[in-house]
Swiss-Prot record:
The gene is GDCSP. Its cofactor is pyridoxal 5'-phosphate. It is found in: Mitochondrion. One of its GO terms (molecular function) is pyridoxal phosphate binding. Residues 1-64 form a transit peptide. Pfam families: GcvP2_C, GDC-P. It is an enzyme of class 1 (oxidoreductase). This is Glycine dehydrogenase (decarboxylating), mitochondrial.
């Protein structure tokens, strides 16, 4: 029996080995879609098992266990970098090189190759289990006190159904900005809910789909006021009752616009100068007071001054909406709607305004349109005002914002509904009122007399002494000055917490009552003239999903409409849609990281501070810089911060005249938009036929502006996906003419471990942690854009007015720039993601990631070059980590545009590559190191198949205007309609490739009509009656 079993096993092994050999002999890629064996790795687990078993059968003597076999099995790089060593060699050979290293040597210029990178602390990389233990250790060093600091940040309950099914769900957090509307209808609906929530609560008809934080939203509103008045008035007033971080950000931002910011008490505001473009007030004020701004706003308008109001969404469930008071623009944060404080972020901010100023709004806006069948569909509206189109003339440099957090806040409103939100608001207000009444009974301190919502202002003889007593009881209060404390309440506060506060403020005296005993005596303290009477959140969506089952199903319904990395690769060029590993994501929702106030004493955040120091050191090693600021909370914010640091450096040397920024025409639109925000004059330089910066044109521009040259903005590798051989010469030209080199870190995924911005010659660079370092894109945010600088720029890194910060490591001297973001360390809660990625990958893992990203791009380019022209390659015929295929010829031969190819890719189950940038009429493809060879082949096969579909049009076999590409994508509603008038079959429309039979992602709408949507702009949920009218009108 035993002998028969062995013989059977040997027969099976022999067949497996034979099959694997046959599969390897057929390895060379083919454009045919009907060879499924090609999608199986030549070294599949079965093959490995067969080889190992064969060896064990052929070995008759016992073997000792090697030390290597006893090492931990949960190493991370092999889980992140998809291509196996054998696949790497075969892919390199297919590209014409003997090995991966030979390909890299031919691709990355030797003049900029750096020595092997050696990371501090994590050179060898931690395993996943070691990393979790390390993060738990860091978390244990953070002390979560009960926070009453307020200032725009509050404790909140994150409903578990939202925590698990949205924040912790890769189907929600792994998508990019919804550029392909047909496969983004779920989060587009949720973002429309967010916009509706904002417009309802603020009383203004237009809202964007999130901004970075409240402080930067206020700065954007200030810029709007300047633009509305066409820059004719150059003073912006800020009431002293605004949050200090907001005031500081506006002051920093104003420098670039040549605006004068004046902070003044409300009672002292006047407009006699005739030079005031706008005024910012807080409602409720930073110290809690509620003021009636009605007459104030009328007076401002009488003098031609625009009014910006920073407000609190929860307060607006009880207060008269700012729009009804006459405010022109309303800004604020949605953080307390179910988003953790996270030591400062990420949180979704908002900006609402009137229809009159809609084209001057910053950020993404979601609007309603129709699809190809006339059915309502959503998409991003009014994109022509954004930076990727208008460049330096854009309303803002903002692109990535906070979509994931906006979705959380929107779902919080959906879950609670209007009545639930009112109840929470009334409860918070009642607790604050109870506390105020109790303090008056105690008589140990003086309580403010002005009306308040959630924040009680207390006058005392020694604020620090009271705060120290509170700290000993794990309570944080806000010290305003030596004699003033504020106490801000939130939805997590209980009556027992109020009793604890009474003990603190009793100053050693007994407390003869309880909060519960006096709560029933407390009345609504909001004046009748400021009490909200207008209903809000009346749409059915906000009144339907109030049980967990219902919200769970609603969340699942929406996520099912969106293609994410759960389904397939997202090959967007310049976006780096790589793996967001589970171990990296886990610490984000741990309470010890999530529930700390950004202005808590730093000793309570020792774990965070240790991580910041280590992360700063790691990033310095990776980039070749001397210091880092972690404050910028998006790539665009990093660009702006880096240029402002350069500006501050020139100013410190007396070079006030240096304001010229040279930018290649191929640069991303944020570059000129950011430079314009810093008050720089932009000089554009062209590129040559190979996609490189025209060095002679650059030299002439630099020399012509040598007395005024501030900076060059350059992306490396270039936006054309090429390592420019002359990058070191380019940096030298700028330095020789008195300028600084700003490197856009968008393509850092092709530098790590191979070269670095500092080694190349850059003076400052921002890193997109949401690209190279694995923070998920969240469907349009969050992001992080920390900036690294050389030593001479380190003194000018951003600081903060509440918690002083600067470079990491700290420079010898400091002349810091003002605040760039509302929180001292930006969106600190997501920094553990990048930290764990770097620590687990180690030096070699990170270097291998860069190499494999380059290999994957070259492999795909080689596969596609027979079917599509590949633009721009380096001197040895290779590309960097991304490449561009040229579709321009198809417009003449087949009437096909890049959009047609992108929409047809949806039918194949893929998100389209980046369209028509940096070259119009092209697609830019970036595969990343995280995609397997099988997935790369599947995408290539889809594009090759589409090329055959184009060929059928070119041959005249298919109508040029009515074909499968022009009709794409094909949702089930279209395919199952009674009438089918297309000249191709329903089956061909739906199943153009064999792999789709086993698993297919279905779009839920036909091609969306962007022009119709912009001409009939609707950016909120319509009431049911209006939806019926709209449907009838489109029909």
């Amino acid at each position: 029996m035993e002998r028969a079993r062995k013989l059977a096993n040997r027969a099976i092994l022999k067949r497996l080995v034979s099959q694997s050999k046959q599969s390897r002999s057929n390895e060379i890629p083919s454009s045919s879609l009907y060879r499924p064996s090609r999608y199986v790795s030549s070294l599949s687990p079965y093959t490995f098992q067969a080889r190992n078993n064969a060896k064990s059968f052929n070995t008759q003597q016992a073997r000792s266990i090697s030390v290597e076999a006893l090492k931990p099995s949960d190493t991370f790089p092999r889980r992140h970098n998809s291509a196996t060593p054998e696949e790497q060699t075969k892919m390199a050979e297919f590209c014409g090189f003997q090995s991966l290293d030979a390909l890299i040597d031919a691709t990355v210029p030797q003049s900029i190759r750096s020595e092997s990178m050696k990371l501090p602390k994590f050179d060898s990389g931690l395993t996943e289990s070691q990393m979790i233990e390390h993060m738990q250790n860091l978390a244990s060093k953070n002390k979560v006190f009960k926070s009453y600091i307020g200032m725009g940040y509050y404790n909140t309950y994150v409903p578990p159904v939202i925590l698990r099914n949205l924040l912790e769900n890769p189907a929600w957090y792994t998508q990019y900005t919804p550029y392909q509307a047909e496969i983004s209808q779920g989060r587009l609906e949720s973002l429309l809910n967010y916009q509706t929530m904002i417009t309802d609560l603020t009383g203004l008809p237009m809202s964007n789909a999130s901004l970075l934080d409240e402080g930067t939203a206020a700065a954007e509103a200030m810029a709007m006021c300047n633009n509305i008045l066409k820059g004719k008035k150059k003073t912006f007033l800020i009431a002293s009752n605004c949050h200090p971080q907001t005031i500081d950000i506006c002051k920093t931002r104003a420098d670039g616009f040549d605006l004068k910011v004046v902070t003044v008490d409300l009672k002292d505001i006047d407009y006699k100068s005739g030079d005031v473009c706008g005024v910012l007030v807080q409602y409720p004020g930073t110290e809690g007071e509620i003021l009636d701004y009605g007459e104030f706003i009328k007076n401002a308008h009488a003098h031609g001054v625009k009014v910006v109001m920073a407000s609190d969404l929860l307060a607006l469930t009880m207060l008269k909406p700012p729009g009804e008071l006459g405010a022109d623009i309303v800004v604020g944060s949605a953080q307390r709607f179910g988003v953790p404080m996270g030591y400062g972020g990420p949180h979704a901010a908002f900006l609402a305004t009137s229809q009159e100023y809609k084209r001057m709004m910053p950020g993404r806006i979601i609007g309603l349109s129709v699809d190809s069948t006339g059915k309502p569909a959503l998409r991003m509206a009014m994109q022509t005002r954004e930076q990727h189109i208008r460049r330096d003339k854009a309303t803002s440099n903002i692109c990535t914002a906070q979509a994931l957090l906006a979705n959380m806040a929107a779902m919080y409103a959906v879950y609670h509904g209007p009545e639930g939100l009112k109840t929470i608001g009334q409860r918070v207000h009642g607790l604050a009122g109870t506390f105020s009444a109790g303090l008056k009974k105690l008589g140990t301190v003086e309580v403010q007399d002005l009306p308040f919502f959630d924040t009680v202002k207390v006058k005392c003889s020694d604020a620090k002494a009271i705060a120290d007593v509170a700290n000993k009881n794990d309570i944080n209060l806000r010290i305003v000055d030596n004699n003033t404390i504020t106490v801000s309440f939130d939805e997590t506060t209980t009556l027992e917490d109020v009793d604890d506060l009474f003990k603190v403020f009793a100053l050693g005296k007994p407390v003869p009552f309880t909060a519960q005993s006096i709560a029933q005596e407390v009345e609504n303290l909001i004046p009748s003239g400021l009490t909200r009477e207008t209903p809000f959140l009346t749409h059915q969506i906000f009144n339907s999903y109030h049980t967990e089952h219902e919200l769970l199903r609603y969340l699942h319904k929406l996520q099912s409409k969106d293609l994410s990395l759960c389904h397939s690769m997202i090959p967007l060029g310049s976006c780096t849609m790589k793996l967001n590993a589970t171990t990296e994501m886990m610490p984000v929702t741990w309470p010890s990281f999530a529930n700390i106030h950004p202005f808590a004493p730093t000793e309570q955040a020792a774990g965070y501070q240790e991580m910041f120091d280590d992360l700063g050191a790691l990033l310095c090693t990776i980039t070749g810089f001397d210091s880092f600021s972690l404050q910028p909370n998006a790539g665009a914010a990093g660009e702006y911060a880096g240029l402002m640091v350069i500006r501050a450096y020139h100013m410190s040397r007396g070079d006030h005249h240096r304001n010229v920024c040279i930018i290649p025409v191929s640069a991303h639109g944020t570059n000129p938009a950011s430079a314009a925000m810093c008050g720089m004059k932009i000089v554009a330089v062209g590129t040559d036929a190979k996609g490189n910066i025209n060095i002679e044109e650059l030299r002439k521009a630099a020399e012509a502006n040598k007395d005024n040259l501030a900076a060059l903005m350059v992306t490396y590798p270039s936006t054309h996906g090429v390592y420019e051989e002359g990058i070191d010469e380019i940096c030298k030209i700028i330095h020789d003419n008195g300028g600084q080199v700003y490197m856009d870190g968008a393509n850092m995924n092709a530098q790590v471990g191979l070269t670095s911005p500092g080694f190349i010659g850059a003076d400052v660079c921002h890193l997109n942690l949401h690209k190279t370092f694995c923070i998920p894109h969240g469907g349009g945010g969050p992001g992080m854009g920390p900036i690294g600088v050389k030593k001479h720029l380190a003194p000018y890194l951003p600081s903060h007015p509440v918690v002083p910060t600067g470079g990491i490591p700290s420079p010898d001297k400091s002349e810091p720039l003002g605040a760039i973001s509302a929180a001292p360390w930006g969106s600190a809660l997501i920094l553990p993601i990048s930290y764990t990625y770097i620590a687990m990958m180690g030096s070699k893992g990170l270097t291998d990631a860069s190499k494999i990203a380059i290999l994957s791009a070259n492999y795909m380019a080689k596969r596609l070059e027979k079917h599509y022209p590949v633009l721009f390659r380096g001197v040895n015929g290779t590309c960097a980590h991304e490449f561009i295929i040229d579709l321009r010829g198809f417009k003449n031969t087949a009437g096909i545009e890049p959009e047609d190819v992108a929409k047809r890719l949806i039918d194949y189950g893929f998100h389209g590559p980046t369209m028509s940038w940096p070259v119009p009429g092209t697609l830019m493809i970036e595969p990343t190191e995280s995609e397997s060879k099988a997935e790369l082949d599947r995408f290539c096969d889809a594009l090759i198949s589409i090329r055959e579909e184009i060929a059928q049009i070119e041959k005249g076999n298919v109508d040029i205007n009515n074909n499968v590409l022009k009709g794409a994508p094909h949702p089930p509603s279209m395919l199952m309609a009674d009438a089918w008038t297309k000249p191709y079959s329903r089956e061909y429309a739906a199943y153009p490739a064999p792999w789709l039979r086993s698993a297919k992602f279905w779009p839920t709408t036909g091609r969306v009509d962007n022009v119709y949507g912009d001409r009939n702009l609707i950016c909120t949920l319509l009431p049911v009656s209006e939806m019926a009218e709209e449907k009838a009108a489109t029909a």
